[in-house]
């Protein structure tokens, strides 16, 4: 994409990071939370510039809630805190990967990760001949 | 969110899956590609209903390219194919996690993953006192 929406809200995010961040039309980028030691993908949230800034500077994962329209510090309500271990942007700066140490369940359903319950395909059983794999 | 945009394009996706898929305003959902055995997060792409259908049924990861406005079978140009091992939706059906076996580099830059080059924070060095972690 040749242009990117500007931040929707005021932010203290480092100007150089903000300059290369490529936001969706709603001013957000998807943020993948991954357990730092096991590699499990825990959940995907959304960050605006300020949520990324807070994630980088407070040691706690902070997201922008699209449904509630407010910042959301993971674990503030549930106790299921995500302590930030590392943060990276992807090659075109439109996705964040946060490696975290997750306290308790990552999912609001109580499941360990948000991807445990709704498995569409397992064990590569898509009918593709083994010779093609 | 109480409603979700409908598919933008015709699709053969299973009707029950399509009924619970919660798409962004552009009709897409983010899709995380993770190496199935090492747990590395390789990249994030975008899928519409038909890209998800093809990913579920062909054994190859298929995305919707937002910049080119077309389907994109990972590896068709580069040879860096992603063979599908499993596919899951998250708890609110607005994100896809695809575990894959990645051939070669996942990133178009030649890097192993798309998250290798632009690290914003390492080793939890956010200045949070150790006692709080």
From Swiss-Prot, chains A, B:
Organism: Streptomyces avermitilis (strain ATCC 31267 / DSM 46492 / JCM 5070 / NBRC 14893 / NCIMB 12804 / NRRL 8165 / MA-4680)
Subunit structure: Homodimer.
UniProt subcellular location: Cytoplasm
PANTHER family: HISTIDINE BIOSYNTHESIS BIFUNCTIONAL PROTEIN (PTHR42945), PHOSPHORIBOSYL-AMP CYCLOHYDROLASE (PTHR42945:SF11)
Known cofactor(s): Mg(2+); Zn(2+)
Positions of Mg(2+) binding: 90, 92, 94
Record text on cofactor binding: Binds 1 Mg(2+) ion per subunit.
Protein's job: Catalyzes the hydrolysis of the adenine ring of phosphoribosyl-AMP.
Residue positions binding Zn(2+): 91, 107, 114
Alphabetical UniProt keywords: Amino-acid biosynthesis, Cytoplasm, Histidine biosynthesis, Hydrolase, Magnesium, Metal-binding, Zinc
InterPro entries to which the protein is assigned, alphabetical: PRA-CH (IPR026660), PRib_AMP_CycHydrolase_dom (IPR002496), PRib_AMP_CycHydrolase_sf (IPR038019)
Molecular function per GO: magnesium ion binding; phosphoribosyl-AMP cyclohydrolase activity; zinc ion binding
Protein name: Phosphoribosyl-AMP cyclohydrolase
């Amino acid at each position: 994409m040749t242009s990117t929406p500007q931040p929707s809200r005021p932010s203290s995010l480092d100007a150089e990071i903000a300059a290369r961040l490529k936001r969706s039309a709603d001013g957000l980028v998807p943020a993948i939370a991954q357990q730092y030691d096991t590699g499990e993908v825990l959940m995907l949230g959304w960050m605006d510039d300020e949520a990324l800034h807070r994630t980088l500077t407070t040691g706690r994962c902070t997201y922008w809630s699209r449904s509630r329209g407010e910042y959301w510090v993971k674990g503030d309500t549930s106790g299921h805190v995500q302590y930030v271990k590392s943060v990276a942007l992807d090659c075109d700066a439109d996705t964040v990967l946060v490696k975290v140490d997750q306290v308790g369940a990552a999912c609001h359903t109580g499941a360990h990760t948000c991807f445990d319950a709704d498995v569409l395909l397992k064990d590569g059983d898509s009918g593709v001949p083994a010779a093609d794999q």
